[in-house]
Amino acid sequence: MAYIQLEPINEGFLSKISDLLLCRWTCRNCCQKCYECSCCQSSEDEVEILGPFPAQTPPWLVSNRSEDKEGDSDNTTSEPPATPQDTSPDRRRSSSDTSRSTYSLTRRISSLESRRPSSPLIDIKPIEFGALGAKKEIVQPTVLRKSYTPEDYFRKFEPRLYSLDSSNDDVDSLTDDEILTKYQLGMLHFSTQYDLLHNYLNVRVIEARDLPPPISYDGSRQDMAHSNPYVKICLLPDQKNSKQTGVKRKTQNPVFEERYTFEIQFLEAQRRTLLLTIVDFDKFSRHCVIGKVAMPLNEVDLVKGGHWWKAIIPSSQNEVELGELLLSLNYLPSAGRLNVDIIRAKQLLQTDMSQGSDPFVKIQLVHGLKLAKTKKTSCMRGTIDPFYNESFSFKVPQEELENVSLVFTVYGHNMKTSNDFIGRIVIGQYASGSPESNHWRRMLNSNRTAVEQWHSLRSRAECDRVSPASLEVT
């Protein structure tokens, strides 16, 4: 038998009606109290209680339950008091049966209440942390909130602020005529074409027009009306494997007509940027950058090729590269010999406007801070990419090896005046840089094996600043 749960009213006349008809446990068939109607008299197992159960037991069940418990403790069955209206045996028997049914129902409700699920409401209390004897700190639990990222968050990032050449970023939005009017550095004419058969990129430097006159650093205007320009060509980001045109003397409209070839795969060439740097070689053997032209090769048809006139824009590079030198070092502990091979150099600065350069290399052994030995290679005529393949040997005991330095200086031969300085590096105890120190360390760990390495030449002032051995040589 099923029972429905209703809310009683605790005041006035309606309280009496609810006590009879709207009590918490009312028979669904006759709407009487469950312990008074005859249709509800059944065994404990046949009673079906529908929940959820109230938090408190009805007052009329509490009173009856207490009476039943007292009677049960005395092992006697208590009977409800007889009503003055009817004291017949049938009425007393009915009341006794009702009392037993009530006690069964009360016991069932009590057992179910003990298993009643807890309330879904969660009472959040502060969490206390702290060591024994220390001041307690109350930490309130916080509500996790989803982070919000504005839509224009990444738009605020400005890559030009992190660019090495951020001053020229606005040039991309200008036309060639606007660039020419703004900077007045002239125009450069060149062409490109890719050879699919041989995997070569051919670059032809044709001419330049309206180059600016050179700037006088000493205030004199003698021989400063015209420039002595030349062009350096490379494929970014690789600036080491560069090419260089000859110097055109005293002209603002030089005609070069020189072709250069870069061995590179087609897909790799499309990822490169062709950089042409226009440089002025003045009478004081100074190399001043006039400007540059940069063209991404993925923006043009390399196979078809083409000719372009491009406006020259300013360059952040104030000094040009001095060139590179390929060396090989080897030490034989048993013989106490330090062997040096001068293999080749490339892209050396020109020291003569008409003939290019006549470069040679001077090798000087410095023991501590004292010059011990000097040797030099032969002079290569009219080239900026000389091949030497010359070997030199120095007597250095093993216990003194850590106290020696090798100074390599590249000069351009000059028959009229003193030789022209091109570049220098120092290897050994007083190295001029980390690449030089790395080469020396690799040689010491090579176990008699020759170690080759390319080195970028440095200026005399830079070497003198970081290497005491550079100050001891001429």
Swiss-Prot record:
Pfam families in UniProt: C2
GN (gene name): syt17
UniProt similarity note: Belongs to the synaptotagmin family.
SMART domains reported for this sequence: C2
Provenance organism: Xenopus tropicalis
Span list, region Disordered: 54-112
PROSITE patterns per UniProt: C2
Membrane topology annotation: Peripheral membrane protein
Organism placement in taxonomy: Eukaryota, Metazoa, Chordata, Craniata, Vertebrata
Record-level GO cellular component terms: membrane
Low complexity composition-biased segments: 96-112
Record keywords, A-Z: Differentiation, Membrane, Repeat
C2 domain: residues covered: 184-310, 321-455
Source domain of life: Eukaryota
Function: May play a role in dendrite formation by melanocytes.
Compartment list: Membrane
Keyword Repeat listed: yes
CDD domains reported in the protein's UniProt record: C2A_Synaptotagmin-15-17 (cd08390), C2B_Synaptotagmin-17 (cd08410)
Any GO BP: cell differentiation
The protein's name: Synaptotagmin-17
